[in-house]
UniProtKB/Swiss-Prot annotation:
Protein family: Belongs to the influenza viruses PB2 family.
Name used for this protein in its record: Polymerase basic protein 2
Pfam families given in the database record: Flu_PB2_1st, Flu_PB2_2nd, Flu_PB2_3rd, Flu_PB2_4th, Flu_PB2_5th, Flu_PB2_6th, Flu_PB2_7th
Its biological purpose: Plays an essential role in transcription initiation and cap-stealing mechanism, in which cellular capped pre-mRNAs are used to generate primers for viral transcription. Recognizes and binds the 7-methylguanosine-containing cap of the target pre-RNA which is subsequently cleaved after 10-13 nucleotides by the viral protein PA. Plays a role in the initiation of the viral genome replication and modulates the activity of the ribonucleoprotein (RNP) complex.
Intracellular or extracellular location(s): Virion; Host nucleus; Host mitochondrion
Superkingdom of the organism of origin: Viruses
Molecular function, one GO term: RNA binding
Annotated positions for site Mammalian adaptation: K627
Subunit structure comment from the entry: Influenza RNA polymerase is composed of three subunits: PB1, PB2 and PA. Interacts (via N-terminus) with PB1 (via C-terminus). Interacts with nucleoprotein NP (via N-terminus). Interacts (via N-terminus) with host MAVS (via N-terminus); this interaction inhibits host innate immune response.
Cellular component, GO annotation: extracellular region; host cell mitochondrion; host cell nucleus; virion component
Xref: InterPro entries: Flu_PB2_2nd, Flu_PB2_6th, Flu_PB2_C, Flu_PB2_CAP-bd, Flu_PB2_middle, Flu_PB2_N, INV_PB2, PB2_helical
Paired cysteines (S-S): none
Gene Ontology biological process: 7-methylguanosine mRNA capping; cap snatching; DNA-templated transcription; symbiont-mediated suppression of host cytoplasmic pattern recognition receptor signaling pathway via inhibition of MAVS activity; symbiont-mediated suppression of host gene expression; symbiont-mediated suppression of host mRNA transcription via inhibition of RNA polymerase II activity; viral RNA genome replication
Amino acid sequence: MERIKELRNLMSQSRTREILTKTTVDHMAIIKKYTSGRQEKNPALRMKWMMAMKYPITADKRITEMIPERNEQGQTLWSKMNDAGSDRVMVSPLAVTWWNRNGPITNTVHYPKIYKTYFERVERLKHGTFGPVHFRNQVKIRRRVDINPGHADLSAKEAQDVIMEVVFPNEVGARILTSESQLTITKEKKEELQDCKISPLMVAYMLERELVRKTRFLPVAGGTSSVYIEVLHLTQGTCWEQMYTPGGEVRNDDVDQSLIIAARNIVRRAAVSADPLASLLEMCHSTQIGGIRMVDILRQNPTEEQAVDICKAAMGLRISSSFSFGGFTFKRTSGSSVKREEEVLTGNLQTLKIRVHEGYEEFTMVGRRATAILRKATRRLIQLIVSGRDEQSIAEAIIVAMVFSQEDCMIKAVRGDLNFVNRANQRLNPMHQLLRHFQKDAKVLFQNWGVEPIDNVMGMIGILPDMTPSIEMSMRGVRISKMGVDEYSSTERVVVSIDRFLRIRDQRGNVLLSPEEVSETQGTEKLTITYSSSMMWEINGPESVLVNTYQWIIRNWETVKIQWSQNPTMLYNKMEFEPFQSLVPKAIRGQYSGFVRTLFQQMRDVLGTFDTAQIIKLLPFAAAPPKQSRMQFSSFTVNVRGSGMRILVRGNSPVFNYNKATKRLTVLGKDAGTLTEDPDEGTAGVESAVLRGFLILGKEDKRYGPALSINELSNLAKGEKANVLIGQGDVVLVMKRKRDSSILTDSQTATKRIRMAIN
């Protein structure tokens, strides 16, 4: 207050005012500050005093031929004075107005194409709806967000190559456009920008916006997809928020969302297969999202989500070094620990072997709807500060932290046996057992934890075992805060290893992620996800399994046919028949299988009973482990459309309908493909396959005795010759091969040779 009085006093003296307004600044430090370097030190001030001058703009001399000296009001538009230090002329801001109103109009066709991201933003805002403004405390946490809607996902280097190729195609320099997306974009942009007059530099800047993901670490309280971030300044302040619904979607958000759904589906499916890692890789490589290969998206897309990270790790890509537990991302901010196995007893006297973290550590925990700071020592929670959207989210965070602390009172709070299993029916590890148990019901845990009186600290309150807030008492070590905990900002990625069961470890051997951490949330993908792998057939329900299984047999009929006769066991074990088994009633699966296998054996033995359509139809039923029984079936039941439908062993049905004339197969009314083979190839194919390992020498030769049946051939010694009865009663002379190595070619050549021998 004193200072202000003093200043007022000084200002009232005319001499003070004069000194401040008239004296030159001659203090060297000040002159240095404002004159060194090219960087403008006070842009706003500079702009103000520049615009107060009459001619603050410089322009190329040619402008004097294109703009009159005075406008309609008689105001001067440019000065005859040259700009000091360049051969440009000084121009008034009024000249800009004149040019905008009366200047030449160029072709504007390229503008929407170049400034695409801006035009699209205007459209989104035009069609978006802004709702009411609410005043409330905003729990914002800094997250890494995408600030640039509508971009492709190229790396900076890839984008640079595309931009150079589009904007400066004749410049020298090695540019290698390899990825599919690079080539597509380059072609598209070159066509769009033919005869474009906009300055190349501007075009390059705008292309960069379109091709590269730009992220910033910003405080966010609501949606984090880029169409929300672009209006962040309109939707949330320090104490207010405004409801907003975007007026359009952008592909990059859709890719992120669909990638997460595809990754979750794939990890869940892989976890229950015999070799999870191999299955996961097979599925990632055969899946497309919005027409782009999933593996390409994984390489470029920085989305961090548990399932996505598991897929990335499997492909050998680096991922974030933070670890996941109970759906929260943990990042150690200080301290260290060593791990040691320890046996503990639950409240139900069940023994658990847990890996105890010995030592003092601090973590940040970030979830979708709650965040926390956790300080812990060996098997002891020291402090937990939680903030969250609602009571439910806060409770989730507290449970995860209490389990993670490995405190004895948590383990003693277990009631009943722990026997949770994952999707593959394997027991979960002890930490996840405990987590699942308390996620189901945490009452005993909270009651047993204990409470303590609390000090009044700004911005913090206590929370009682029944989840009600309090300013006097709180559960031991637990406090609720108004402020959120920021997400880990670093984009550092580390090399990790992944085992067969999809557990991911860092180089010190700490588990960062496992399939148990993958969310069970189901969603509908925005872009079409095409899973080509048979493992994913069941994702669209039983009908899709049925159609896909038969489509697969028809597409691969040539190889299936040979295996059917040569090595049926290998064929029955093919993974493509796995999903089909879930459609066959469990009680009868084995009998169906035994029945079909016997039927197939008869077809192999008795020539002429081979029936392509019937083999295709019954083949999936033979894949189950067979039970021997005398039962005969005229039809099989499959569980589709909510009830059992029947497939006839002989003949067509609505489930399986093969049209002999057109060779088209329809399954449940859906087209399942066309069989491509010659009518006589049907039997010849099988016989040629059966004759693998035999060389067909020509027509029957009586010197080698009476014709044998195909089954009797197996008794021949290597190099021995014999006549053999094939097909429609024809006899040919064969010799058993001396070497096995050439067997593969036999089945292809046999068909031709049989024909030559007979004719």
